[in-house]
Amino acid sequence: MVKPKIALIGGGQIGNSIAHLAAMRELGNVIMFDIKDGLAQGKCLDIAQAAPISNFDVQLCGSNDISCIAGADIVVVTAGIPRKPGMTREDLIEINARIMVTVAEGIKTHAPESIVIVLSNPLDAMVTLCQKITGFPTQRIMGMAGVLDSARFASFIAWELGVSVRDVNAMVLGGHGDAMVPIVRFANVNGIPALELLKNKYGDEDKARQVMAGLVERTQDAGGEVVHLLQTGSAFISPATSAIAMVEAVIHDQKRLLPVCAMLDGQFGISGYYVGVPCILGVGGVERIVEFELTEDEQALLDHSVGEVKKLVDSLPL
């Protein structure tokens, strides 16, 4: 049986972590491209030499020639500069847009049948640019943001309540920025609303809502919190793990319902923009966008978030 080919564009910390996770889970053979001489080759060689210890058997290969991605089933794009302290994701747009144009042209030429997952920031703008340059059907171009943002929200809820993160479900919609929209009423611990458990903990509804508001705010700034602590870069393990969840859903046709940055065509009252929404992911990519009724407050927050996305997208060289 021919193993799937997973192409990684960008050999930084996120790309390296994705390569390691993909190999450990034996999701397919991994090819990594980076423009820096020897970087992708060295990182793939390092991971490959761990195979006898970790007991995985896939091929890993690095290259400085983007034609190496030819025939890829999935392309994961992490190329671009990371955030530094004091920077927002939006501050990255000018330089990362130039990088994305080159990357997208390479994907269009060498992997025209692939499904593409973009992680480069500012995410919503970069996935839009990638789709415009490649011209791929929108269901084959998506961004990773909501999986990570939702995991962060779930983690903060679990830590606050003192429960296992395995039992917490949470969902974040909208753009991958400070205006992202954690959906509080959907946050639960094995079906019990998180707000109810906060009320039980504090014995006061107002206090519970105040604490939840703090968790929402921390979720919105979670990436910045990591950047501030690291000082020299941004998060890489959690974004890579989030990307792997999406890669696995596509490769194994899992039909997973995950929050994905997808192109909307009227859903949630939004058309023509990539926005984080619940999607069914399978072998066809974004196979279905799952729409549900928002409250007035939730819709207002989502509209505001989309407004921020529009500002970014409208500044792109399209």
UniProtKB/Swiss-Prot annotation:
Q: Known EC number(s)?
A: 1.1.1.37
Protein keywords: NAD, Oxidoreductase, Tricarboxylic acid cycle
Keyword NAD set for record: yes
Give binding positions for NAD(+): G10, G11, G12, Q13, I14, G15, D34, N96, L119, S120, N121
InterPro entries from the xrefs?
Answer: L-lactate/malate_DH, Lactate/malate_DH_C, Lactate/malate_DH_N, Lactate_DH/Glyco_Ohase_4_C, Malate_DH_type3, NAD(P)-bd_dom_sf
The reaction(s) annotated as catalysed by this protein in its Swiss-Prot or TrEMBL entry are: (S)-malate + NAD(+) = oxaloacetate + NADH + H(+)
GO MF annotations in UniProt: L-lactate dehydrogenase activity; L-malate dehydrogenase (NAD+) activity
Q: Which Pfam families match?
A: Ldh_1_C, Ldh_1_N
Q: Where does substrate bind?
A: R83, R89, N121, R152
- Quick one: signal sequence residues? none
Q: Which GO terms describe its biological process?
A: lactate metabolic process; tricarboxylic acid cycle
Locate the active site. Answer: H176 (proton acceptor)
Question: Family assignment?
Answer: Belongs to the LDH/MDH superfamily. MDH type 3 family.
Q: What does this protein do?
A: Catalyzes the reversible oxidation of malate to oxaloacetate.
Q: What is this protein called?
A: Malate dehydrogenase
